[in-house]
Amino acid sequence: MIKNVYIEEPIFLEDLKVRGFADLIIELDDGSVYLYDIKTINAWSYRMKFGRNKEKDPSIHQELQLAVYGVGVKRRFGRLDGMSLLYYNKDTSVIKEVDIDMSRLITVESYWKEIVKEHSLGLPNLRPNVSPVNDWECRYCLYKTRCDNDNRKEFTNE
C-alpha cells in the first residue's frame, strides 16, 4: 500500500551545488521508495523514442537528471528502490514507463563532485558537448550572460 506521495518535491544537494524538483516520489508501507520523472512529449517524439524506427543513440540527459534527484531522494529517505521516467504522449494520452538503472546514481554523483572540484578553482572554460552538453541547457544557467558576452557564438554558429 502507498504510505506517502510527494509531488514537485524540492531536491537540494548542497555539497554538489545542485537543486531541482522531483516530479513524483512514492513511499510504500514497507518503507520502499520509488522516484518518477514525468516527461510530456508529442506523438512524433514518442515515435522517435519508442517506435519501430526509434533513435539509435538516444540522449541520456533525462536519465542523468532523474539520477540527480535520485541521489537526493536516497539521502532523504535512506533508500531508493527504483526510479523511472514516465513518458506521457500528450497527443494520445499513452504513458510508457522506462526503468532507469540504479548505477546512474554513482555516475551523476561522481560527475557533480568533479564539477564542484573544477569550479572551486574558478569558472571553467566552455567545452562544447561537455559543458554544456546541449545548447538548451544554457537557458537555465546563471552564467548565460557571461557566455553570451564571451565566445559562445563560436560554439553555436550563431
Predicted regions and their residues:
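Short amphipathic alpha-helical face segments that pack within enzyme cores
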Residues: 64-72
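A generic fold-level signal
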Residues: 17-19, 61, 133
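Conserved catalytic cores of phosphodiester-cleaving nucleases, focusing on short active-site segments
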Residues: 20-53, 69
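Well-ordered beta-strand positions in beta-sheet-rich domains
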Residues: 19-21, 35, 63, 97-99
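Histidine- and/or cysteine-centered catalytic micro-motif in compact active-site loops
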Residues: 10, 38-41, 88-90, 137
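A short acidic, glycine-rich active-site loop
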Residues: 52-63
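Metal-dependent nuclease catalytic regions and adjoining charged, substrate-binding loops involved
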Residues: 59, 71-158
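Metal-dependent nuclease catalytic cores that hydrolyze phosphodiester bonds in DNA/RNA
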Residues: 1-33, 138
